[in-house]
Every structure is written in C-alpha cells, then in structure tokens.
Amino acid sequence: MKDCITYDINKCTYDDLSAVGKLYDTVTKYLEEHVNYPKWTHGEYPSLASATIALNDGSLYCVKQGDKIVSAFVLNSDPQGDYSVGDWSKFIPEGEYMVIHSLAVLDECKGKGIGQQVVKFCLDTAKEQGYKGVRVDVVPDNFPARNLYEKMGFTFAGEYDLKRGIEYIPTFQLLEFNF
C-alpha cells in the first residue's frame, strides 16, 4: 500500500455534505465521459441525494487531503439487495457484517493509494465494532474495483441478481472479507 501520503478519513458532517455532493457530481460526469466501470448515473447515483440519506443515517464518510474532500464512501450493515444468494465461504447473518457502498475517488487523485486506505479503514472499523466481516458488490465489468478489493484480501462469492430492480445492471459480483 502506498503510504507516502496520509489522508484523513472521518464520518461526514453536514458541513461536508455539499462538497461530497460535488465530488459525486464530478466523478459521475467524468465516468460518463470516459469508461463508466460502475455504471453510475450522473445526478442519480451516487449523488447529493444519496449522500444526504447516508449522512442522516450516520454511514457517510469522506476522505480529506488537508481541507479538500478527495473521496467519499458509505459503510453500513445494509446490503441494499439480496445478499442471501451469495456463495459465501462463511454464513454471517445480515446485520453482522458491514458493506461498502459508493466508493468514489476524484480522478486526479487516483493511483495514490486512497482506495487501499479506505478499504483498510473499513476493515479496521468493522473489526473494532465487532462485525464478523465486510462484504461488497461490484458491477461485473468494474475491473478497477474488483482488483482493489481482491488486492486487499477479499474473495469472490459469485455473480447474482441482487433484486435491486436496475434493468441495465442485471447482476452484481459479490466479494467478502471475513474476520
């Protein structure tokens, strides 16, 4: 893991919300103009609206370099879909594992180890809070995300319809890290 630059990772506050909304806006615009690996939709997801929901339930985090928000993500125990279908190596009831959602990094900050620091933070947080593991789902062609998670020790748990009702993403790949 690149450790020459350290970032501050904390729960977002209402003061951070506007900047997180702008970050998601910038990232989704960039993805739509380039290769949109996660198939995110500008203005829909992730967005200021989804960030507000996560902030209100205490699951929105931001990564800062100085005063600038360079990344944001959600960490909670809600899979937002049917995770029961996964080929999990270990049965863990819903609510006893954490899930990473909406991990976005500004394009100009990619390749600086932010994603690795975020995943390590999520693993450490889940373990400290007594969860039994961390799970995540990615769009099948989201090679950068899958590579990041596998590099950090996650293992593949199958590709399934999570019953989210997203027609243009019929299946998601599931990954797990158990403690």
Regions flagged by a language model, labelled:
Residues 8, 29-50:
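Conserved GNAT-fold acetyl-CoA-binding loop/helix
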Residues 57-73:
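Conserved beta-hairpin
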Residues 50-62, 78-82, 99:
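A short helix-loop-beta-strand connector motif used in the catalytic cores of GNAT acetyltransferases and
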Residues 1-18:
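Conserved N-terminal entry element of GNAT/NAT acetyltransferase domains
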Residues 74-102, 110, 163-166:
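Conserved acyl-donor/pantetheine-binding loop and adjacent beta-alpha core of acyl/acetyltransferases
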Residues 105, 111-124, 147, 151:
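Conserved acetyl-CoA-binding loop-helix of GNAT-fold acetyltransferases
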Residues 119, 126-137:
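Conserved GNAT acetyl-CoA-binding A-motif
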Residues 94, 139-143, 150-152, 159-179:
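C-terminal "cap" of GNAT-fold acetyltransferases
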